[in-house]
Amino acid sequence: WIMGHMVNAIEQVDEFLDLGANAIEFDVDFDDDGVAKYTHHRIPCDCGRLCTKYAVFTEYLDYVRQVTTPGDPKFRKELVLHALDLKLQRISSEKAYAAGVDVATKLLDHYWMRGWNGGRAYILLNIPLVEDYEFIRAFKDTLRKEGHEQYNAKVGINFTGNEDLDEIREVLEKLGEDEHIWQADGITSCFPRGTERLKKALEKRDTPGYKYIPKVYAWTLVRSSIMRRSLRLGVDGVMSNYPDSVVKVLKEKEFSDKFRLATYADNPWEKFTPI
């Protein structure tokens, strides 16, 4: 999975897909009451990126629904995953539940269309800190109360704050979640980052019987050398400001017979087992 990073303006969606991304990450900005208002990162953001691009959240969902609905004139078959970078750290953790209700409701109304020809892409809920776990509970509660639990099959969870992996597992256990999980490891492209925690996540992923990390991605990679380093370690995904650079690296002899781009037929919640 090549995840285009910080794809917050509507016009950027096709731009990043044209560069080779098959997944997009966008920031969800909330007001003080936990209402999702905009796809907006705010300042500061990654080096070399414009931090001010944004869209109204519901309008953005309307657009990516069209891009991921077969038969729609805007349909792009390559876009198979949306990663929602939920900016919950900007609001009180007491509002995390309200935020979960709001995001689930807006996805039902503007993306899934409550079953009426909605978008087909998978949804990854990127939560910054384990203290905001009530967002997940609220999201699932809302799907159940609205009679649309079928969409749980399309939804995954990812804690992105580089917290202790065992602490993350404990929170997932508390929530009763042991599937549809990704584990991210990374830092803004402005700073270097070692591989110690990334290696630990991959080790857990590859431990037989361990259910809490079936997929791992590294972020935000901009240098080809760091992309190669992550691929050699065996990550499932790379988040980058430059999807075209990831595509070039994947075409190199070292990687071309080991990796391919994920398609809609690939389940993003299953641990990959080489044939």
Curated annotation (Swiss-Prot):
Cofactor note text: Binds 1 Mg(2+) ion per subunit.
InterPro entries in alphabetical order: PLC-like_Pdiesterase_TIM-brl (IPR017946)
Keywords: Cytolysis, Dermonecrotic toxin, Disulfide bond, Hemolysis, Lipid degradation, Lipid metabolism, Lyase, Magnesium, Metal-binding, Secreted, Toxin
Segments forming a coiled coil: none
Binding annotation for Mg(2+): 25, 27, 85
Origin: domain of life: Eukaryota
Protein family membership: Belongs to the arthropod phospholipase D family. Class II subfamily.
Protein name listed in UniProt: Dermonecrotic toxin SpeSicTox-betaIIA3ii
Species of provenance: Sicarius peruensis
